[in-house]
Amino acid sequence: MPLTDPVKLQIVQQRIFLKKVCRDCGALNSVRATKCRRCHSKNLRPKKKELPAKKG
């Protein structure tokens, strides 16, 4: 069921996409993080902003 309400869509996008991913261990961190919460590495990248395509 796709979301049509723009306010709810914006809330969902912020909850899903505003994260950083550790390149060493793959842990999700907050967007303000400078070090990984799990392995304390500084090698973080922003999470990709696209949903993966469905197979099938």
Curated annotation (Swiss-Prot):
Keywords: Ribonucleoprotein, Ribosomal protein
Origin: domain of life: Archaea
GO MF annotation list: structural constituent of ribosome
GO CC field: ribonucleoprotein complex; ribosome
GO biological process: translation
InterPro entries according to UniProt: Ribosomal_eL40_arc (IPR023657), Ribosomal_eL40_dom (IPR001975), Ribosomal_eL40_sf (IPR038587), Ribosomal_zn-bd (IPR011332)
Family: Belongs to the eukaryotic ribosomal protein eL40 family.
Matches recorded under HAMAP family: Ribosomal_eL40
Name by which UniProt lists this protein: Large ribosomal subunit protein eL40
Species the sequence originates in: Sulfurisphaera tokodaii (strain DSM 16993 / JCM 10545 / NBRC 100140 / 7)
Native organism taxonomy: Archaea, Thermoproteota, Thermoprotei, Sulfolobales, Sulfolobaceae
